[in-house]
Amino acid sequence: MNAIGKSSAIFVTLSGLFWGGWIVGSQTPEGQEAIARAYAAYEEQQSAASANLFDSTALRAVVCGDPASTEQKPCLAVVAAGRMFIVDAGSGAASSLTRRNIPMERLAAVLLTDADLPQVADLSAVYGASTHGRADALLPVYGPAETQRLVDGLNQAGGFDGASRGLQAWGPSPEPGRSVIVFEADGLVVSAFTTQEDAFEGRVGYRFDYRGRSIVVGGDGRVATASAARDADIVLQGAETQRVAQVTGAFSAAEAAANAQALNTGMMMLTGADNQIAAQTQVAEARAAGFDEVAAARVGMLVELPLANSEINVRPL
């Protein structure tokens, strides 16, 4: 069992020791010592799992955010080449990553799919967690044209100038059908792209290519229709059930699945469902459209694309 898998097993053991020790003898020195050892083992395994996230053997992504929030909480942490990128800093982004001992100082940039409040709800907290209060720290924020306005407001509220401290906005401004590289180093290429529909709505998608493996992230955009999603190992796409899509005009899970299949996508992960029933319905409708490799994203889920083979591994972190 690898370090990531071991952390779940140790957490179960820790829970059993905690409750068992509390009931039958946590007030004794022996009980307290057992609980302390369990906590130490859990922390050690969590640290090892976090370290493994940043090795060079795979392209990885962690679904982050606040699972208890009733509001939209878009957040995905993509890890490759020893760096981390957060796509959409939704509610609970910083705390969900720090709880899992993921080192926020590895954060290279935040990428916004939409310049709206749900995408930046936790951006200030992400900045604070990633800079550890350094006086001269800057955090690049990429996104649509309106990103500059949002970043300026957050910098003003935090007392930052945006030049030597705070958030620094960058607008890649891709044209429909043409990608723009926003980061390239050590075998990792991060590209921004948009579609005709998403350009009208002010939305941007991102593709991460790392030594033959690829992840495409689009928030609520229609990235599954974009040429940039062709042959991607996995596409993370916001969608709605057929019933909701008919009323709102949103992208349905069935539409997303049909497009993913046409573009030879390896797997599609649906994001943004408000509840478990909606998530299950979306997956069922997507599979009914003829594309079986579909899953619903959940906070704490790890996606791992090993460089040594073509596997797509999905499991809890």
Describe the function of each predicted region.
Residues 84, 91-142, 169, 231-236:
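Active-site metal-binding motif and surrounding structural segment of the metallo-beta-lactamase
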Residues 86-90, 107-119, 142-144, 216-220, ...:
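Active-site neighborhood of phospho(di)ester-bond hydrolases with catalytic His/Asp-centered motifs
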Residues 91-93, 115-118, 147-148, 197, ...:
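Solvent-exposed loop/turn segments at secondary-structure junctions
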Residues 5-7, 19-102, 171-227, 299-317:
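Core dinuclear metal-dependent hydrolase active-site scaffold
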Residues 75, 94, 104, 123, ...:
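Extracytoplasmic/secreted envelope proteins and their assembly/folding machinery
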Residues 106-107, 133-137, 213, 262-269:
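Short, surface-exposed connector motifs at secondary-structure boundaries
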Residues 2-27, 221-304:
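Cap/insert and terminal regions of metallo-dependent hydrolase folds
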Residues 31-38, 137-175:
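Acidic/polar short surface loop at catalytic or gating sites that assists cofactor/ion binding
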